[in-house]
Every structure is written in structure tokens, then in C-alpha cells.
């Protein structure tokens, strides 16, 4: 796993994006087409992943990035998108899955046609991809989410989780790790009262947060491990006049969370750099399609400015530790991503 991002490293990713525009191609690829399939279009986190992917494609040279995804966060719509890409005979697919198992058949179909398939962010089950690129270590993400809200509410009170879809691979893994952290004695007075799902849709996430306020009048915190849900929950807190009574934490983008932090609805939240994630996923998918890497367990892939990515025995790799944002740094980072 790569070392923890510092302020300069995170900002450096964006500097590299600008600098890379005029850089000489690393490889003279011959019309390699890489499709980045996201959970749904119109989500800021994935738009930032796209920007990183475009940087990688430019750096490699001769690589076309096709950024696509469904309009709704369903496996059915993602399957249709992948089927379309198979028909287009793309060279590689990097997908963030809405359902770890439901995507396996269509991804296996793609691979049987010679398309190199990797998953990133939210993984496809191993039999449906070559490798999985995790944005960070799963255990660290889960622990971080619990630690942040615990610090804000002093380890005491009712807390709920507002997640994406019930089938989301990454959110479910993070929630499982949250519960492991929660079992520690220091959280004995901090009770998990509910887990609800907003399906990564802003309106539904907002309504789910409102429902939590009504169902749990003593609620003190909401953990939202989703960039859509955390913004919606924070807005619900502000609109309900609950700032200072209910706090929202989790995973979000600084550019989208600035208002919540300054308003006091959110004390701290975390995320990794989505530009780096999209850059690395595109770089790896393209290099595998070119035959420059295999993605096999135990191998290492040199992913441009992100350095060497080591593939673990389970054919997965992890990037940086989650980075914490609060009032002390939100202004700086909100200008970056």
C-alpha cells in the first residue's frame, strides 16, 4: 500500500494533472480504448475519477478513455452498459460495481471476448475480473469512520449509518469493518441504532436522513460512507435546524462538503484522492491491455506518478490511507477536488 497522503502530496496530484498535459507519452499505444464504468453518471466523486483517467490516457499516449455508466445505481443498468462496450469491442474495462456478484456473468463474457476487465472502488467478485483496485485499506476506512464520529460526540450517543445501495461492495465491506471497530470497549456508550440506504440518490438519501431524525429523537450522529449520502444528510441536518445536535461524518469530497463543515453540520470527514484513483485504474487497465502488465497476484505494476502498485495474493491492491478534512483545511482542499 502506498504511504499516507500529506497535504503536499494531495495537491501534487492536481499539479501533475496540469503538467501531464504537455508531457511526452510513456508508451506509444495503438488506439487502446479503455472504458471507465462508474456506479452512476452525475456523481462528483466519479467525475473526479474521470479527470484522473483522462490524465493517465494523455500520459500513456494513444489511449482513449470512454467514461460511461448508468443513470441509476443498479446492477441491471450497469450490465447493459457493459454489454454495449462488448459490442463496441473496447480493449479494457475498469468498473466500479453496483453489485459484486450480479456483474460477474457480463464481465466474464467481456473477458471471453478478449477485453481486459478490472474493478476499482467497488469490486466485482474475483471470478469476474483480473484484479481489484481499492482506494484505501478497507479496515482503515471502517475504523476511521467510527473514530471520526466518536471524537465529535465524545464516544456517547445514538448513531446511524446512511449507506449507498444495500448491494454496494465497498460500502458493505466498510460497514463490516465499522462494526468491528465499534465492538471496542471505548465505544460502549455509542449505540448503532440503524443502517439505512439512500441508493446514492440525493433525494432518497435526504429523506432517509429525515426518517432517522423522526425514528430516533436522541440521534447524535450519522455516518455516511458515500459522497452522495454525506452531502444529503448534512443538508437534512441544516434544514431541520439540528446543527449542534446531530453531526454527520463519513466519506465525501471537500468541494461538496465545504458548506456542511462551515455550517457546523459536519465536524470531520475523510476521503482519498479520487483523481489519483481514476488515474491509477485507467493506467493499470491500459497497461494490461497493452501487455505491459498482467495484474496477477504477486506482481507489481508501475502506475506512472503513483509509483509501484503491488498486487496482493487475492488479486487486489490498495492505495492511500484516508485523509481527514475539517475547518482547518477545507478551504484549501475544496479548490482541488
Model-derived regions: residue spans:
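Hydrophobic alpha-helical
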Residues: 92-111, 178, 194, 198-260
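Short beta-strand elements in bilobed, periplasmic/extracellular small-molecule ligand-binding domains
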Residues: 59-70, 184-200
